[in-house]
Amino acid sequence: MLSAQLEAYLAEINLSATAEQKKQLIDFVGMLNKWNKAYNLTSVRDPEAMLVRHIMDSLVVSKHLQGERFIDVGTGPGLPGIPLAIMNPNKTFVLLDSLGKRIRFQKQVAFELGIRNISSVESRVEAYQAEQQFDGVLSRAFASIQDMLSWCHHLPAENGLFYALKGQLNDEELQQMPSGFVIKEIIELKVPKLDEQRHLLKIIKE
């Protein structure tokens, strides 16, 4: 059932996946559902809803990624980082979260599903110092763009981008961008079976 739904959703967003990638995505939902009962990783309880709200909500960003090295800040159980890593095996993803149970889950997912292009790090973002900066800094965890830019300003490489995943846009928030940062592009995202606004903001350092 989930496999057929995934197939239809991928076609809807015009994203092609191998049989192995589809299996990994479905197995990720299975692991999330199983671990969630004990670890409380997400408020979404139903696998079909997870497929929409977690997998597809992450994958609509995939075709907009530029570069090879990414960090997903406040990734929780690995969202959007794990679905994006599955679909982009030639890119690398650091998954950053401050809660140990989430990091343990991510590492188990990587081990069981054979995902080799992610590394999970338990750290607060402001304390994290990368050996090499990133082409893209992703997050759907921050309440405000200002918080994201303030805490993650040290992470992108010289021409790196911030990818802020937002629901409904707040005009006031957009007008109060911190100095030194510019919104390069605002992309309206369409998530299959999700009747809610979704936006991707690409932000650069001036």
Swiss-Prot record:
Q: Name one Pfam family in it.
A: GidB
This protein's GO CC annotations:
cytosol
Q: Which domain of life is it from?
A: Bacteria
Name the chemical reaction catalysed here. guanosine(527) in 16S rRNA + S-adenosyl-L-methionine = N(7)-methylguanosine(527) in 16S rRNA + S-adenosyl-L-homocysteine
Going by the UniProt record, its keywords in alphabetical order are: Cytoplasm, Methyltransferase, rRNA processing, S-adenosyl-L-methionine, Transferase
EC numbers on record: 2.1.1.170
Similarity field = Belongs to the methyltransferase superfamily. RNA methyltransferase RsmG family.
Q: What is this protein called?
A: Ribosomal RNA small subunit methyltransferase G
Organism for this UniProt entry: Shewanella sp. (strain W3-18-1)
